[in-house]
């Protein structure tokens, strides 16, 4: 059985023999999360993580129904940004038959987004104060490309998972 700390090195060292097709990905635009309340979610993303509100919008009617393939969909949207990434928060106002999904990190279909941070312990404490709880204790990577990096998952009330990484090998964003 392979140690999980080898995964980052293995993926980073992988080479491909063929170039990507011309229609391939050339840039990441955003990561989207569906939440119960944009206002509650903004407390985490802005007050804890330090993102900035970029804009708000709403969608209803034919466009969003075709996009989601769900009749009667009405969405509220907030876009928030931090250096290098944008998060899209979506609050579904309709239809009413929605559910909260909270898969474990090992469950198929589980998704998370990861961020390097300046102070993992402070962020975990601030997150916990508003209901975003660490899934386990902070772990230290003991070898490979991420050696010395502390990391932890936190999950919010909506089931959104975020991985926090603090590394002595990655330049701090606080300058």
Where are these regions (language model features)?
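Vicinal oxygen chelate
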Residues: 1-24, 28-37, 75-85, 101-175, ...
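Short hydrophobic/aromatic-rich motifs at helix boundaries and adjacent loops
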Residues: 12-15, 49-50, 94-97
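Aromatic side chains
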Residues: 33, 44-45, 51, 92, ...
């Amino acid at each position: 059985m392979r140690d999980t700390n080898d995964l980052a090195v293995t993926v980073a060292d992988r080479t491909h023999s063929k170039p990507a097709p011309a229609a391939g990905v050339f840039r990441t635009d955003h990561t989207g999360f569906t939440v119960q309340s944009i206002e509650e979610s903004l407390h985490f993303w802005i007050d804890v993580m330090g993102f900035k509100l970029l804009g708000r919008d709403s969608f209803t009617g034919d466009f969003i129904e075709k996009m989601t393939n769900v009749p009667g969909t009405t969405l509220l949207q907030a876009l928030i940004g931090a250096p290098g990434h944008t998060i899209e928060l979506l609050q579904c106002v309709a239809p009413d038959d929605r559910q909260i999904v909270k898969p474990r990190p090992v469950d198929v279909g589980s998704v998370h987004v990861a961020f390097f941070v300046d102070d993992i312990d402070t962020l975990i404490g601030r997150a916990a104060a508003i209901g975003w709880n660490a899934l386990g204790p902070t772990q230290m990577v003991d070898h490979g490309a991420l050696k010395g990096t502390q990391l932890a998952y936190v999950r919010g009330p909506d089931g959104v998972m975020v991985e926090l990484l603090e590394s002595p090998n990655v330049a701090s964003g606080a300058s």
